[in-house]
């Protein structure tokens, strides 16, 4: 059996390497666990990209543009649905509909929306699109070539994720 010299340079630096590794893992875990109200930009952009793909497959020739007003309307409704457990669709806790919220956000065109509610902390854009794709009413909204603008927002808590997409036809 060979005995290792605990004072050799390779073993003296081991504890600092181990501590650095553990510290990095701990820091990574803290960075990954973003606050519930964080801007889920990558998720939202993924939804926009996937809706654009569906529109393209439906034969739509215009590019989908992100509208700040529609994004704001989507944000308001996503927060409302997240914080009011009895909501799971288009009507807000104040009785507002998607057109009301879009108008309040400064959008004057015709709008529709799709809403996804998931009973977990995390949701991804493919789960959202799959949910909407297989609902005939939502698929019709996503593939409607007249809807040339979009705003997407998602929010999550420890036990609920909500994603809202508001689609617009400019006035």
Positions of PLM-derived features:
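Generic alpha-helix initiation/capping and coil-helix boundary signal
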Residues: 14-17, 21-22, 67, 71, ...
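Polybasic, low-complexity, intrinsically disordered segments
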Residues: 37, 42-45, 140, 171
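Secretory targeting and sorting signals
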Residues: 1-38
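Short, charge-rich amphipathic segments
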Residues: 9, 58-73, 142, 165-171
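A well-ordered secondary-structure block
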Residues: 97-171
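Short, well-ordered surface patches within globular domains
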Residues: 39-101
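Short amphipathic alpha-helical segments with coiled-coil-like heptad repeat character
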Residues: 3, 82-83, 142
């Amino acid at each position: 059996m060979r005995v290792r010299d605990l004072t050799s340079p390779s073993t003296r630096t081991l504890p600092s390497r181990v501590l650095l590794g553990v510290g990095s893992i701990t820091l990574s875990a803290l960075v990954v666990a973003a606050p519930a109200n964080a801007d889920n930009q990558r998720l939202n952009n993924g939804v926009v990209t996937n809706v654009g793909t569906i529109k393209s497959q439906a034969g739509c020739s215009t590019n989908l543009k992100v509208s700040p007003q529609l994004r704001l309307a989507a944000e308001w409704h996503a927060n409302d649905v997240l914080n009011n457990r009895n909501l799971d669709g288009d009507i807000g806790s104040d009785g507002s509909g998607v057109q009301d919220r879009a108008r309040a956000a400064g959008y004057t065109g015709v709008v529709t929306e799709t809403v996804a509610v998931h009973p977990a902390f995390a949701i991804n854009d493919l789960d959202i699109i799959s949910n909407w794709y297989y609902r005939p009413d939502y698929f019709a909204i996503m593939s409607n070539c007249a809807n040339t603008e979009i705003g997407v927002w998602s929010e999550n808590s420890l036990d609920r994720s909500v994603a809202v997409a508001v689609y617009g036809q400019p006035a």
